[in-house]
Regions:
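Carboxylate/His-rich catalytic cores and anion/metal-binding grooves
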Residues: 193-197, 203, 259, 266-297, ...
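N-terminal pre-Walker A segment at the start of P-loop NTPase domains
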Residues: 208-243, 278, 286-302, 307-318
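Glycine-rich phosphate-binding P-loop
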Residues: 242-274
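Conserved NTP phosphate-binding and transfer environment spanning the P-loop NTPase/kinase superfamily
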Residues: 390-393, 399-567
Length: 567
């Protein structure tokens, strides 16, 4: 390991040389108070910036163990450190001048959700801090600008480290509040099943967002207030007593007029699988962490999924126990999404009528009279929803605005009236008595077969040059094969998409051999991340990308939409 002085001498020596000479800086250097590692050097000032990491010993950083003693507190502290370091980066970004990306200093940008990220890691045993960032090495044209480079690494970064990564220079009260909030959120998440709840929305929560492109809370929004009949009281370790609407396990129907807040409530519930930062308005909107938002997804591929509990006796004689298509219809795609959510061990399904296939959700009486049941291959979701709960323990929350078909089978019916929820279960049930319930399915469905065993694709054998590109939150391209994730609506960050791409790459190289089921493959991926961190997916310290941890359910969703998956 070299010293900081040796690094300065090296950069001074290569000043004004051709840009590739920066490659000589790759390595580890001891700075006062921290270790600097230059992991990857860009080949050109206009290329993706260089990757740099900083390690601070726990004794020097000085963060109290009480701030990271549990997994969720550790993630919250890491998130806070990324935000603090990011603020410092913004202060110095592009202050060092030059061509292309010269002077760029950046770290992962965190949103409203608190996610585990590769950008910051704290060793729970030693308190050591590992920060990963990107730096644009300065150049004049395509020649090295050592003077500006030295400003970044000997002036700007040392100040960022001192201000953001040393506890003595941080706001101790703020960090304690962040830790306490994380502990309260986890306590609330843990207590839901004990109370027979699948979700909780605290009184005073702000559910609407600022705009379609901003996840910040709407300033003029109506604060959430639980109906008296659904209000529950919970005592948290730090916040104390908190009250709000408890959504019980079973079948919950959310109804109301257009623009009254139905979908806004459902959106808050679907993102309640994540913890949110203080001030977001949804800090205490907590949903079963395995909940999955489902919808129709015309055109998606389906790979040997057993959809026979919903679709049978197709006119073309196609086998629906191992259904395969490259262009699914709305109803078929939604049926596959339900079964795949079961495979991913979802405990709650969240469905909005607006984005569902009508013929998958219901069949009204007139249609059943005109088109006999024996002529219809689709068993609608309404005929399986009770079975899903009673046999599989899967609860469902449905938003409906045009059909009252689900009134008969719902356990709880909530009306959104000018953004205020009301429990109208008894009233709606009484009205529903005047409309006889349609007959249910003739027999219970056979439990889907989850024995799919993916194999390694031919293009992966002996090929170390597989290219991958993240396309925002919507898709990822692997070896020119695009995995469309537009309708996996609980992905909140493009870094989660990048992580999903690395999950696929790692699985293709190490796990897919035709002997393991997809469930076993995903379990092994989760185990690796849990034991070795997200960065372990990248397999090389020089190639660690900006990653955010996806849930198990999103890992399944990615494989399910991977057209190149060989089964």
């Amino acid at each position: 390991m070299k010293t900081a002085a040796e690094l300065r001498q090296l950069v001074t020596r290569i000043d004004h040389r051709s840009y590739p000479a920066y490659k000589d800086t790759k390595g580890m250097y001891q700075f006062p108070g921290y270790l600097l590692s230059i992991d990857h050097v860009q080949g050109d000032p206009f290329a993706s910036p260089s990757r740099v990491s900083i390690q601070v010993k726990g004794k020097i950083a000085g963060f109290p163990e009480q701030l990271y003693r549990t997994k969720w507190q550790k993630t919250a502290l890491e998130d806070a450190l990324i935000r603090q370091f990011g603020q410092c980066c913004e202060k110095f970004g592009f202050k060092a001048k030059g061509s292309g990306k010269s002077g760029m200093i950046s770290i992962s940008r965190c949103g409203q959700e608190v996610l585990e990220r590769s950008a910051a890691q704290i060793d729970e045993k030693t308190g050591d801090i590992h920060i990963r960032l990107e730096v644009g090495f300065p150049a004049n044209g395509r020649t090295i600008n050592a003077r500006e480079w030295i400003r970044i690494f000997f002036e700007f970064l040392p100040e960022c480290v001192e201000k953001a990564l040393y506890y003595k220079n941080c706001d101790a009260k703020r960090l304690q509040k962040i830790s306490d909030l994380a502990e309260d959120q986890q306590a609330l998440r843990d207590i839901l099943p004990k109370l027979g709840l699948c979700a909780f929305v605290a009184n005073g929560s702000i559910l609407p967002r600022e705009s379609g492109v901003s996840a910040r809370p709407m300033k003029s929004a109506v604060c959430f207030q639980s109906p008296e009949e659904m209000e529950v009281e919970i005592t948290l370790p730090h916040r104390g007593v908190i009250r709000g609407m408890g959504i019980r396990k079973g079948i919950t129907l959310i109804v109301g007029g257009g623009y009254h807040g139905k979908s806004t409530l459902l959106k808050a519930l679907e993102l309640g699988v994540y913890n949110h930062i203080a001030g977001d308005g949804r800090e205490y909107v907590i949903t079963d962490s395995t909940a999955v938002k489902l919808r129709a997804e015309d055109g998606r591929s389906i790979k040997k999924t057993d959809i026979s509990m919903f679709i049978n006796d197709l006119p073309n004689g196609k086998d629906t126990t191992h259904f395969y298509t490259e262009d699914a219809s709305g109803s078929t795609s939604q049926a596959a999404n339900v079964v795949e959510a079961m495979e991913a061990k979802a405990g709650v399904m969240l469905i909005d009528e607006d984005t569902s296939a009508t013929n998958f959700m219901i069949r009204d009486e007139l249609m059943q009279r005109v088109i006999h049941r024996d002529m219809e291959p689709i068993t609608p979701f309404i005929e399986r929803i009770r079975e899903l709960y009673e046999e599989e323990g899967i609860s469902t929350v449905i938003v409906a605005g045009s059909s009252g078909a689900y009134f008969h089978i719902a356990d709880c019916i909530v009306q959104m009236d000018r953004y205020v929820p009301k429990d109208i279960t008894q009233t709606a049930k009484k009205e529903a008595e005047q409309f006889p319930q349609l007959s249910g399915p003739k027999e219970k469905a056979k439990k889907p077969d989850f024995a799919r065993k993916p194999q390694q694709g031919r293009e992966w054998k002996g090929n170390d040059r597989i290219k991958m590109k993240t396309l925002g939150k919507e898709a990822i391209s692997i070896n020119r094969e695009t995995i469309d994730l537009r309708y996996v609506e609980q992905i909140t960050d493009s870094e989660q998409v990048t992580a999903l791409g690395y999950c696929v790459k790692y699985a293709q190289r190490h796990l897919l051999d035709g002997t393991r089921t997809l469930q076993e493959v995903v379990a092994m991926l989760e185990e690796k991340i849990e034991k070795e961190s997200l960065a372990a997916l990248c397999e090389s310290t020089s190639s660690v990308a900006n990653l955010a941890r996806p849930r198990t359910q999103e890992i399944f969703a990615c494989f399910d939409r991977y057209r190149g998956l060989k089964l």
